[in-house]
């Protein structure tokens, strides 16, 4: 189980995850939990430096800003010491690293801001 952090100023929830490069190097990042994103992981193309395999470079998706074409990679994410190979949506317009609703199908999200509890596991 990993502990999250609530950004009160922007009303956003973040969890620290690790992105794993093909060389095994771990990069720790704060990922925004976005319940409007139905995938596993999304990130800006300038943040992609992991030598992950490309699956599709013209994948159409609807976003809050309309439809766009994105690249899809298979990336490795480490959460709470466990590694997952997941599809990663990559595009120039994605402002930060995002984890989406697919995680909530495999991980339990507990949020009680009054009690200071925010966990994913």
Protein language model annotation of sequence segments:
Residues 1-121:
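Pepsin/retropepsin-fold aspartyl endopeptidases
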């Amino acid at each position: 189980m990993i502990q999250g952090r609530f950004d009160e100023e922007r009303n956003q929830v973040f969890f620290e995850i690790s992105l794993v490069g093909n060389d095994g190097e771990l990069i720790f990042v704060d990922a925004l939990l976005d319940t409007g994103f139905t995938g596993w992981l999304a990130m800006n193309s300038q943040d992609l430096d992991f030598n992950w395999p490309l699956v599709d470079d013209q994948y159409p998706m609807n976003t809050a800003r309309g439809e766009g074409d994105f690249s899809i990679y298979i990336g490795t994410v480490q959460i709470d010491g466990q590694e997952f190979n997941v599809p990663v949506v990559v595009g120039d317009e994605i402002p930060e690293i995002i984890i989406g609703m697919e995680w909530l199908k495999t991980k339990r999200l507990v949020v009680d801001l009054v009690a200071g509890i925010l966990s994913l596991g």
